Amino acid sequence: AILLVEDSVRYYSTYLPELYKLILKQSAEFLKETLNEQQRKGRKRSRPKILLATNLDDAMIFYEKYKNNLLGVISDVGFVRHKEDSPDKEQLDAGIELVRYIRKDDPLMPVLLQSSQDAMSAVAQELGVGFIRKWSKTLMIQLGEYIKEEFGFGDFVFRDAERIEYGRASNLKDMEYLVKTIPDDVLIYNTSKNMFSKWF
């Protein structure tokens, strides 16, 4: 699952179709590899779901319920704490509180913060999470690139700790070959970051 935390109808109406497109594209790629009809049906049923939370309480509930199956989290910085709160009670750092909670529980969980405030970029960097500016003309491109890179969509890219690329697998045959040929330290780095489970 992907957890989207956003209280603006405008933004979640923009994000949801893009997320669905990425999921369907990834599912189609995986379906090319399945061997029989039963496996194909299983893959279709197991494609990631998108969980939409519009307040901090729901975000925490979704995180706790699905954390073992989350590919990542995309969160606004400011939103209300409780479902029944009016918009004027928006907590300007609710997203930061959520990120700290998630990081304490799972330091490897990919998280993307989004805000219209440029200053939040430094906060995201300090927290070790991605950041996109809401008003950016390339918002959807940045969102797609982050998801492909961090949520395990697209090719599996073997990188070392310095982010140097050692190989790219677009299917299981490529993966099998690369696992046998890349340096051991690169393989260990990728397994220690829990990257395989997201791609498979």
Question: Each PLM stretch: what is its role?
Answer:
Residues S8-Y12, D57-D58, G78-D85, Q117-M120, ...:
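Short acidic, S/G/P-rich loop/turn micro-motifs used as interaction or catalytic elements
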Residues V73-S75, I96-M120, I132:
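A short, hydrophobic beta-strand element within the central beta-sheet of small alpha/beta folds
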Residues A1-R10, Y15-R40, I50-L52:
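Conserved acidic segment of CheY-like receiver
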Residues E18-L22, E90, L127-F131:
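Short secondary-structure boundary/capping segments
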Residues S116-F200:
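Long, compositionally biased intrinsically disordered regulatory segments in eukaryotic proteins
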Residues I61, H82-L108:
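Short amphipathic alpha-helix used as the core "switch/output" element in two-component signaling
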Residues F30-G72, F79-H82:
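Acidic, metal-coordinating helix/loop segments flanking the phosphotransfer/catalytic sites
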Residues A59-K65, Y101, Q142, Y146:
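CheY-like receiver
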